[in-house]
């Protein structure tokens, strides 16, 4: 009974002093020893009692975050590839510096143009001293499909009548697209003249016909063909460029009423009636191509809207305006601008025309003799890995045998091994043996016979395999 009462007293003590340190005394194990007595006091006296301040939590040293590298990558220049984006690994680029990849790898030459998309500048590569046109598009002016132009270039195989794409990267919230440097646009070339002569007009028609046919054969639509997007080299070879509104027929529906991006960005001067309503197809490209040839061949005024817009699409054009064009080309343009899209000829059908076929044969012969630097030389990538391995030119086109054809023909001679040299002799003091051995030469000395040890001799003698 006494033990039960003692346990109850201990329990009461623990309950009353649950916030205090309680321990058993060494001298009297059954007696409780506390640091202070339990007493009733006022709030004033309680406030005067000094309490031990809580321990200070020392700040721990921050450990290296596993996401720190990912945060650094956001500020680094990233090259765009068909599978995503990667950090640029060029030796010309140092991520530790605040300068952009453009400042590291290029020298700025001049501004080529500005627009609602951004700007285009001419720059010279510091490693190759080649000139390029670099298109800069700020992120604030990019739409949802912000990489449409870059991926459009990647999906198009190289062609001599399409502006060549080299690479694209993102840096400092700006999309950069590195392109082939051309001389000027077709619109700038025609500025200040009435119209193109028949020979030049046919060359423009044939060059763009081949480039547009290459696009359509790869299931791509340009959607913005006009003289401003047709570029000329110094040798007057026309190339199709500016793929800001390009679309893939394999991944996007042809008849899509949600083509608001095209309806807002497309130029109404060169759009067909069905394209304005949102129906994009190869026939809408054919219409834009035909009306562009009409403009540079006749110097006709193309309104973006108004009373003159509809008569042109109905081919209600005065004869005196069409007079500078040849009859064959005029008939082709009329077919290309037919109000019924399905009645317009395709690029392959235009190439089968007997007049076009003959002129195309002559044009190809002319272009073959024109030195095209971008056509035959491999693409100069500034990064460690190519974003498009399939776009690189084949090594079979590189003529590497020129270095060996001019070399002097000699028969190599390999000297025989000399076993007569001692370890301490200098091998450079010994001449190589001649081709014709000399009699009684030290090179013909036979090796001295070495008799085997006696134990081995006795072993062979027992087996009758050794003759002395």
From Swiss-Prot:
It catalyses: L-seryl-[protein] + ATP = O-phospho-L-seryl-[protein] + ADP + H(+); L-threonyl-[protein] + ATP = O-phospho-L-threonyl-[protein] + ADP + H(+). It is found in: Nucleus. One of its GO terms (molecular function) is protein tyrosine kinase activity. Its main location: nucleus. Its EC number is 2.7.11.1. ATP binds at residues 112-120, 135. Gene3D superfamilies: Phosphorylase Kinase, domain 1, Transferase(Phosphotransferase) domain 1. Residues 106-357 form the Protein kinase domain. The keyword Transferase applies. Residues 49-61 have a biased composition (Basic residues). One of its GO terms (cellular component) is cytoplasm. Residues 25-63, 425-453 are annotated as: Disordered. The active site is at residue 224. Belongs to the protein kinase superfamily. Ser/Thr protein kinase family. WEE1 subfamily. This is Membrane-associated tyrosine- and threonine-specific cdc2-inhibitory kinase wee-1.1.
């Amino acid at each position: 009974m006494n033990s039960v009462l003692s346990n109850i007293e201990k329990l009461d003590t623990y309950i009353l002093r649950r916030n205090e340190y309680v321990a058993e005394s060494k001298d009297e194990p059954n007696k409780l020893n506390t640091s202070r007595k339990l007493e009733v006091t006022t709030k004033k006296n309680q406030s005067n009692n000094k309490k031990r301040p809580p321990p200070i939590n020392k700040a721990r040293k921050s450990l290296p975050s596993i996401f720190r590298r990912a945060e650094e990558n956001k500020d680094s220049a990233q090259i765009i590839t068909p599978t995503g984006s990667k950090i640029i690994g060029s030796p010309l680029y140092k991520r530790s510096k605040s300068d952009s990849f453009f400042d590291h790898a290029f020298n700025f030459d001049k501004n080529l143009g500005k627009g609602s998309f951004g700007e285009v500048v001419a720059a010279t590569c510091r490693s190759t001293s080649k000139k390029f046109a670099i298109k800069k598009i700020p992120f604030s002016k990019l739409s949802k499909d912000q990489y449409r132009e870059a991926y459009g270039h990647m999906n198009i195989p190289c062609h001599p009548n399409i502006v060549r794409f080299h690479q694209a990267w993102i840096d400092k919230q700006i999309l950069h697209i590195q392109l082939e440097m051309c001389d000027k646009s077709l619109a700038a070339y025609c500025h200040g003249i009435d119209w193109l002569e028949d020979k030049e007009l046919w060359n423009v028609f044939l060059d763009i016909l081949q480039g547009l046919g290459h696009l359509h054969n790869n299931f791509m639509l340009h959607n913005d063909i006009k003289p401003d997007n047709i570029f000329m080299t110094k040798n007057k070879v026309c190339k199709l460029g500016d793929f800001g509104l390009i679309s893939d027929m394999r991944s996007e529906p042809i008849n899509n009423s949600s083509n608001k991006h095209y309806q807002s960005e497309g130029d109404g001067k060169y759009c067909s009636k069905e394209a304005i309503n949102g129906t994009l197809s190869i026939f809408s490209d054919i219409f834009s191509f035909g009306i562009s040839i009409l403009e540079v061949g006749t110097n006709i005024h193309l309104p973006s809207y108004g009373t003159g817009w509809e008569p042109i699409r109905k081919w209600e054009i005065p004869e005196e305006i069409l007079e500078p064009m040849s009859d064959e080309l005029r008939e082709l343009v009329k077919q290309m601008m037919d109000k019924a899209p399905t009645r317009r000829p395709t690029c392959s059908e235009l190439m089968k025309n007997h007049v076009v076929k003959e002129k195309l044969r002559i044009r190809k012969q002319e272009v073959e003799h024109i030195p095209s630097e971008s056509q035959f030389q491999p693409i100069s990538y500034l990064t460690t890995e190519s974003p498009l391995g399939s776009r690189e030119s084949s090594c079979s086109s590189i003529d590497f045998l020129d270095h060996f054809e001019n070399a002097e023909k000699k028969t190599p001679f390999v000297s025989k091994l000399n076993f007569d040299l001692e370890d301490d002799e200098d091998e450079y003091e010994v001449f190589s043996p001649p081709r014709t051995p000399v009699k009684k030469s030290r090179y013909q000395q036979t090796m001295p016979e070495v008799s085997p040890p006696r134990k081995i001799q006795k072993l062979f003698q027992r087996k009758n395999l050794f003759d002395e």
